[in-house]
């Protein structure tokens, strides 16, 4: 399962969701601005990262942003 960490009105978050649907990959979307705790958890999980989307596997492996997701999907086929 892939976790997408993003925000509302994030074009690349929507692109990531569409790309995962195209590859028929299951994902969970987490809006990091929903609560202050979720925002804090995002910065703790991805130290030094200030952009969304950020994608990770449920085992904790950090894929990266949208560009890294495309590369990861191409290599996982």
Language-model segments: what does each one mean?
Residues 1-25:
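Local sequence-structure signature of Cys/Sec-based thiol-disulfide redox active-site neighborhoods
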Residues 6, 31-32, 36, 59:
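Short loop or secondary-structure boundary microenvironments that flank
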Residues 11-14, 37, 64:
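Residues that form or flank phosphate/diphosphate-binding pockets in enzymes
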Residues 24, 56-57:
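Short glycine-enriched loop/turn motifs at secondary-structure junctions
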Residues 27-29, 62:
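Conserved beta-strand scaffold positions in the cores of enzyme catalytic domains, especially
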Residues 57-77:
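Non-catalytic, surface beta->alpha helical segment in thiol-disulfide oxidoreductase systems
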């Amino acid at each position: 399962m892939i976790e997408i960490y993003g925000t509302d009105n994030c074009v690349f978050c929507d692109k990531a969701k569409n790309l995962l649907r195209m590859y028929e990959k299951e994902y969970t979307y987490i809006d990091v601005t929903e609560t202050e705790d979720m925002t804090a958890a995002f910065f703790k999980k991805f130290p030094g990262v200030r952009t969304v989307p950020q994608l990770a596997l449920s085992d904790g492996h950090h894929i990266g942003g949208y560009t890294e997701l495309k590369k990861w999907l191409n290599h996982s086929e």
